[in-house]
């Protein structure tokens, strides 16, 4: 009986280590999945915000992708919510009634904004995976494009451009 008890010394420690490893692996996977869903939501919201701004601001206004990316007008840099997302990842297209790109003010009927070249990186230690974001696209009909009929000027964010 004494010999059997000596052979089982340390089995609890090994079992705890295996179960602990699996528990933390599942915990990190759940956290990473939540972070991925949050990132996808922010990407979709960025396209929606940018398309909304592009439909009511002049087509040459440089702050549209900056503000659509959750930053202040005139600033630049990464999105305040997710890393490696900046205004260069937002592609703004002005479309005519047929869906073709145009830059003629009177022909613009729609605004399309897409997320391009965004790479999602995991934060799990020792597991560095990079995922390309799916295509997030928002298309909205144009509104004023910043034109104020009473004054004949173009304005956005409270300032004339």
PLM segments and residue spans:
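Alpha-helical assembly-interface signal, strongest on the long, hydrophobic N-terminal helix that forms
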Residues: 2-70
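Short, conserved structural patches
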Residues: 52-161
């Amino acid at each position: 009986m004494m010999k059997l008890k000596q052979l089982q010394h340390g089995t609890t420690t090994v079992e705890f280590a295996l179960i602990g490893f699996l528990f933390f692996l599942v915990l990190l996977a759940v956290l990473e999945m939540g972070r991925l869903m949050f990132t996808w939501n922010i990407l979709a919201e960025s396209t929606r915000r940018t398309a909304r701004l592009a439909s009511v601001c002049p087509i040459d206004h440089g702050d549209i992708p900056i503000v659509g990316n959750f930053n202040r007008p005139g600033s630049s840099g990464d999105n305040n919510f997710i890393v490696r997302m900046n205004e260069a990842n937002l592609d703004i297209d002005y479309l005519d009634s047929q869906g073709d790109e145009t830059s003629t003010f009177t022909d613009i009927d729609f605004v399309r904004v897409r997320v391009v070249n965004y790479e999602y990186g995991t934060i799990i230690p020792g597991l560095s995976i990079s995922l390309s974001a799916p295509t997030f696209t928002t298309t909205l009909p144009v509104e004023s494009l910043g034109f104020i009929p009473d004054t004949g000027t173009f304005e956005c964010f409270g300032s004339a451009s």
